[in-house]
Amino acid sequence: MDEVIPFIAQRNTSGRLPIAVGCSLGAMHAGIVALRRPDLFGGCIAMSGIYDASYFTGGWMNSKWYDNSPCHFLQNMPSDHYYINMYNERSLIFCVGQGAWEQNGISTLLIMASIFQKKGIHAWCDFWGYDVSHDWDWWKKQIRYFLPKVLDGSAIGNK
């Protein structure tokens, strides 16, 4: 953050905050930075991520893993935390297919959708079809679908 955010700020002439984008493990990272630092990011497009860090550690968790596990840190965020208003002014898009190799992404996105609803966070959780697999061909289609909505502002506060 100490290097990449100033680098982007020097070159960004739009006046808009950057959007974190990623697929698979990159989706988890995009979600983490957008949710941990809504002051620095205008949102995220997270495709086919797993948002429970304990998945990668066999259930083991410490404070560092917790801080990087959206399913955990959001669950325990107070419902009146000032970040929630910031989230609702951002484009938070989480999508997953329902085809091959997407099962863990589906289960953690269902958890995230439930947390978002309970906290009043207007993130867009989109579950694509049963033919949509954990693959680049689909991520290319998804980014072409979501990016224009982020750029025109129609994804802000989307339910």
Question: Which role does the model predict for each range below?
Answer:
Residues 1-159:
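Non-catalytic cap/lid and distal C-terminal segments of serine-dependent acyl enzymes
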